[in-house]
């Protein structure tokens, strides 16, 4: 009997060699991606990619979630394909499939994503709606912009992000909550809204890093339809939080999602915040909320009294509106104190209100001297106090001098001639001209108006 060697197919061995070759290629590409994008980006997005197979010029990779797949496809796929083709010219395309890691902690959490997203943000205050926001000239632009964003299903061109800024207690948070309430209760479209403070964003980011749930953090924040971050100035000087905020911002803008941000100052004045973030915060509509006027303060008090279903004499409301100028919170707090006097049997009069609020009124009427104004304005513009009295007409000196005159007229009881005498013996006509110049610039130059608002806070 002739014994012949059996035929052994080489196909199986060819497949082993092919898979091994492609694994080596994939390792090279991973090293290239690491060197190209750096450790942070690689670990955040690309390290989760796994090689599955290669057949007929098509490479198949896998990741654990659809979100990661979409992100890599949009931001890194061209580069991955280019790197692979430089190693193997037969490769025509790369596809990514989602293979859930069912036993991983990450996916257990994702099954409860709705609950997780619900806990992602901060609770909304039911008092803060558009209906009970009192509108006046100082907040008209911010209110209109906020309502347009809330009512629009898709981001409005030129209003993404919407950036609201103004001093403490002027209504920024009220508008933020109002936007969120309107969207949540809108029957036309169910959008996922997350509202939170910048401080909470930072602490959630730190928690995610410590618990190694950073991918969950990214997916949660980058899968919302509307992200609202209050008091963004809090991330000033916090480099790693700024880095994550920057990438979250970009991811949402790329997906055409709406952002609403608030701060106590304009984007350009956010000291300690990276320039690239400040630039992006100013991409859309920047709306400031100015200090309240007498009319607006009176309107707020009247609305509050109506809401409380109480009677407060008109002269008492006018007294409060005229004397409590700092912010809306203090104004409403003053009203609450005054109304409580009726609970102990005292009538609400201007006299009783004055007695009840004596400490608050004293702080709101702190006297400011012309010398103090000159010193603070000079420090702000980095000039000498002596330049305030000099006759030099350089623009770098004349403008600060005019601003100091404007504040002297606004914050002191001095007559125009008295003010002029404190500025190198100038006459009252020069003071009037200076005040008008400053008022005109405030109306026409937003950057100038910001400087005035920042200076104004120094005298309070």
From Swiss-Prot:
SUPFAM superfamilies: P-loop containing nucleoside triphosphate hydrolases (SSF52540), TrpR-like (SSF48295). Keywords: ATP-binding, Cytoplasm, DNA replication, DNA-binding, Lipid-binding, Nucleotide-binding. One of its GO terms (cellular component) is cytoplasm. CDD domains: AAA, Bac_DnaA_C. Residues 123-342 are annotated as: Domain III, AAA+ region. Residues 343-460 are annotated as: Domain IV, binds dsDNA. It holds the Pfam family DnaA_N. Transmembrane segments: none annotated. SMART domains: AAA (SM00382), Bac_DnaA_C (SM00760). It comes from the Bacteria. Its main location: cytoplasm. It is found in: Cytoplasm. ATP binds at residues 169, 171-173. InterPro entries: AAA+_ATPase, Chromosome_initiator_DnaA, Chromosome_initiator_DnaA-like, Chromosome_initiator_DnaA_CS, DnaA_C, DnaA_dom, DnaA_N_dom, DnaA_N_sf. Belongs to the DnaA family. Plays an essential role in the initiation and regulation of chromosomal replication. ATP-DnaA binds to the origin of replication (oriC) to initiate formation of the DNA replication initiation complex once per cell cycle. Binds the DnaA box (a 9 base pair repeat at the origin) and separates the double-stranded (ds)DNA. Forms a right-handed helical filament on oriC DNA; dsDNA binds to the exterior of the filament while single-stranded (ss)DNA is stabiized in the filament's interior. This is Chromosomal replication initiator protein DnaA. The lineage of its organism: Bacteria, Pseudomonadati, Pseudomonadota, Alphaproteobacteria, Rickettsiales. The gene is dnaA.
């Amino acid at each position: 009997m002739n014994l012949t060697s059996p035929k052994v197919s080489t196909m199986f061995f060819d497949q082993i060699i092919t898979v091994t070759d492609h694994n080596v290629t994939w390792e090279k590409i991973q090293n290239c991606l690491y060197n190209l994008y750096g450790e942070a980006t690689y670990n955040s997005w690309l390290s989760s990619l796994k090689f599955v197979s290669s057949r007929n010029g098509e490479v198949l990779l896998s990741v654990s979630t659809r979100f990661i797949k979409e992100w890599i496809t949009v931001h890194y796929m061209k580069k991955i394909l280019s790197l692979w083709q430089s190693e193997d010219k037969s490769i025509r395309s790369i596809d990514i499939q989602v293979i859930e890691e069912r036993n991983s902690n990450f996916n257990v959490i994702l099954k409860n994503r709705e609950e997780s997203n619900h806990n992602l943000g901060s609770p909304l205050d039911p008092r803060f709606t558009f209906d009970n926001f009192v509108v006046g000239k100082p907040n008209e632009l911010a209110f209109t912009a906020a309502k347009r964003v809330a009512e629009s299903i898709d981001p409005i061109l030129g209003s993404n992000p919407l950036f609201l800024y103004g001093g403490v207690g002027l209504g920024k948070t009220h508008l933020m909550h109002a936007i969120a309430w309107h969207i949540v209760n809108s029957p036309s479209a169910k959008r996922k809204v997350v509202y939170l403070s910048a401080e909470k964003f930072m602490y959630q980011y730190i928690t995610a890093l410590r618990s190694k749930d950073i991918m969950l953090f990214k997916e949660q924040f980058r899968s919302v339809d509307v992200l609202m971050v209050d008091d963004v100035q809090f991330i000033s000087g916090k480099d790693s939080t700024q880095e994550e905020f920057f990438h979250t911002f970009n991811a949402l803008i790329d997906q055409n999602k709406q952002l609403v941000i608030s701060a106590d100052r304009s984007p350009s004045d956010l000291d300690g915040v990276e320039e690239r973030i400040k630039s992006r915060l100013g991409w859309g509509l920047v709306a400031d909320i100015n200090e309240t006027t007498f009319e607006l303060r009176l309107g707020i008090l009247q609305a509050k009294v109506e809401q409380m279903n109480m009677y407060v004499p008109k002269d008492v409301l006018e007294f409060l509106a005229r004397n409590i100028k700092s912010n809306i919170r203090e104004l409403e707090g003053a009203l609450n104190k005054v109304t409580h006097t009726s609970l102990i049997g005292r009538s609400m009069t201007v006299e009783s209100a004055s007695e009840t609020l004596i400490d608050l009124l004293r702080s709101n009427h702190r006297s400011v001297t012309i010398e103090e104004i000159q010193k603070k304005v000079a420090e702000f513009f980095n000039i000498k106090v002596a330049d305030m009295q000099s006759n030099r007409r350089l623009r770098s000196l004349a403008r600060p001098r005019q601003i100091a005159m404007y504040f002297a007229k606004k914050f002191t009881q001095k007559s125009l001639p008295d003010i002029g005498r404190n500025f190198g013996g100038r006459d009252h006509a020069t003071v009037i001209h200076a005040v008008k110049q400053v008022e005109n610039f405030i109306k026409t130059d937003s950057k100038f108006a910001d400087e005035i608002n920042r200076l104004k806070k120094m005298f309070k």
